[in-house]
Every structure is written in structure tokens, then in C-alpha cells.
Design a protein with these regions (language model features):
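GST-like domain detector, emphasizing the conserved glutathione-binding G-site
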Residues: 1-121
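GST-like fold's C-terminal all-alpha helical module
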Residues: 93-195
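Short, flexible loop segments at boundaries between secondary-structure elements
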Residues: 196-204
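Charge-dense, extended regions
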Residues: 203, 207-211
Length: 211
């Protein structure tokens, strides 16, 4: 099987997580930013991740990929409902979190932005979605205050999380994205959670790029 991704993309992280967790072999292929032709040829639209299955067919949608791969090797890990409290936390933090993360993603060390043209394409895409990225960067102190308050509230929610389940495919990609932000105040429970899930799924954090 072959998994087509962007390295920065939190939805792609979900697909990478299930392969790492199941210890199943997969070839990872990075689609360049600005390349709409490749994903459109595969699934009819510009989207990632895309799983290229052994029979030559293609599967988009991150959680569909998670559930498909989950069924290839026991035990199943992604068949339980998502924890409501964690889901609500993710929804409440996503706005300020991505306002912090996106400007840093545009400057990040990711294979899909390895050429100047690809980086320009990604930056233009995010400016269309988020507006002036310099203005967003200038809001960092206020955004960090909001996100760090949310991180404090997350501590009891992750304290009891040990085995990876469906909820972690929602929570971990968000928190992994946030590790690119210098000053994000992960509490001890969140730090332990990130380290554990990163190790179990073989998905690296972005802490070494934090700015």
C-alpha cells in the first residue's frame, strides 16, 4: 500500500498513526503543495491523505483510511465512539490553535514545501483561508493566552488516557500541530500523552521546529 500525504497535515497524521500503531508496512509518498493534478487524477479532487490500496484503487478521507487499516490487523482500536468531552475541547480550541499554527506551517521544514514554488503555493492557499499571516503572527501573545488556558483545562481529560482509541485520532493530530508553536504550555499530562502516542504510532512531533 502507498499513502499520499502532506507532512504538516493533521488529517494525514491520522492515517500515519494507524499504520504505525498496527506496525503495517506502507510506502509514504508526499504530494507537493500546488500539485492539484496528482490527487485529482486519483480521487477527482485536491485532497489528502489518499490511500493507494494493493488492488490499485484509491481511498480518500482520513477516518475512512483509519477504519480500513484498523480492520487489517487485530485488535481493532478505532471502533469506539469519540469521547464527548475531548471532542468538545478540540472544537473549542481549533480556532485559536490554527491561527497560531498556520503561519508557522508556512515556514516549516516539510517535504511538500521543498521548492520555492511549492512554499509559495501553500502560503497563498493559507492566506486565502486565514487572511494576512503577518497579522496573525502579531496576535501570537493573545492567541497563546487563549490556547494555554485550554491546555490547562485539557490536563484532567488526558490523565486517564493510556491505550490509543478513536478519540486519539482526533486529539493527537491537533496537539502535534501545536508543538510547532513556541510558548505552548503543555501541562505534564499533555506532555506525557504526546510522548506516549508519538512513540506508539511512530509519528514524530514538531517540537524541533517550534517558533
Amino acid at each position: 500500500m502507498k499513502l499520499h500525504i502532506y507532512e504538516h497535515c493533521p488529517f494525514c497524521v491520522r492515517a500515519l498513526m494507524i499504520f504505525g500503531l498496527k506496525k503495517l508496512p506502507v510506502e509514504v509518498s508526499v504530494i507537493m503543495e500546488g500539485d492539484a493534478e496528482t490527487p485529482t487524477r486519483m480521487v477527482g479532487r485536491k485532497v489528502v491523505p489518499i490511500l493507494e490500496k494493493e488492488d490499485g484503487t484509491y481511498m480518500p478521507e482520513s477516518m475512512d483510511i483509519v477504519r480500513y487499516v484498523d480492520g487489517l490487523a487485530a485488535p481493532r482500536v478505532a471502533d469506539a465512539p469519540i469521547d464527548d468531552a475531548v471532542k468538545q475541547w478540540c472544537e473549542s480550541v481549533s480556532g485559536p490553535l490554527f491561527n497560531l499554527v498556520i503561519p508557522r506551517f508556512t515556514e516549516g521544514d516539510f517535504a511538500e514545501m521543498a521548492t520555492p514554488e511549492a512554499r509559495r503555493a501553500y502560503t497563498a492557499r493559507e492566506e486565502k483561508a486565514f487572511g494576512d499571516l503577518d497579522a496573525l503572527r502579531a496576535r501570537t501573545p493573545a492567541l497563546l493566552e487563549q490556547v494555554n488556558a485550554k491546555l490547562a483545562a485539557l490536563e484532567p481529560l488526558v490523565a486517564g488516557r493510556h491505550a490509543v482509541d478513536t478519540t486519539d485520532f482526533i486529539l493527537f493530530p491537533l496537539l502535534r500541530s501545536l508543538t510547532i508553536v513556541k510558548g505552548a504550555a503543555f501541562g505534564p499530562q499533555a506532555q506525557a500523552y504526546l510522548a506516549r502516542v508519538s512513540a506508539q504510532t511512530q509519528v514524530a512531533l514538531l517540537s524541533d521546529q517550534a517558533k
